[in-house]
Amino acid sequence: MAAVSAKLVKELRDKTGAGMMDCKKALAETSGDTTKAVEWLRQKGIASAEKKSSRAAAEGAIGSYIHTGARVGVLLELNCETDFVARGDLFQGLLRDVSMQVAACPNVEYVSTDDIPQDIIDREKSIEMGRDDLDGKPDQMKVKIVEGRIGKRLKEMSLLDQPFIRDSSMSVADLVKEVAGKIGENVKVRRFTRYTLGEGIEIKQVDFATEVASMTNS
């Protein structure tokens, strides 16, 4: 891949509205040719999706997914701008794929890292700062190590940061962005709930010998 200058990245960003990293990748893939880079971004659905990201997405649909065996279920709200798009195959396919993603990711609790409450972040920092492997390290180094670990942990909790189950070379955020570009509307995952059969129910454990004895005495 060719080296990419900051000036070219800025020019492409101004022209397309795409993110800095997306512009850098597009230019690297096209040997610094801005015209081809624009086409590359459009093919990936990135250029148009970025410009639409600030528009209101008040329509959409709530999808459900029940995993094989009916032990895991998901409800997920996916928003777009028009009811017409919400009924389309591309949108419905995305709704189904993201719902399946939630079912496959038991550790995911939030749509994005921006949704994670500060008290959860503070708790994770406290846990990491107290780990034995940091003993004896300078404070500045501790902070740097913890920041790296926290960043990784927060991404594990974020749906949009997960590798897409059908194509691990892209994230769920990339998938949503790509479909939004193809649809031509702003598309956002608003919220979801994941259900696991029996979750939170305490099962009384009975010793087998005690159970037999109680049956004998009755």
From Swiss-Prot:
It comes from the Bacteria. GO terms for molecular function: translation elongation factor activity. It is found in: Cytoplasm. GO terms for cellular component: cytoplasm. Its main location: cytoplasm. Belongs to the EF-Ts family. Associates with the EF-Tu.GDP complex and induces the exchange of GDP to GTP. It remains bound to the aminoacyl-tRNA.EF-Tu.GTP complex up to the GTP hydrolysis stage on the ribosome. This is Elongation factor Ts. The lineage of its organism: Bacteria, Bacillati, Cyanobacteriota, Cyanophyceae, Synechococcales.
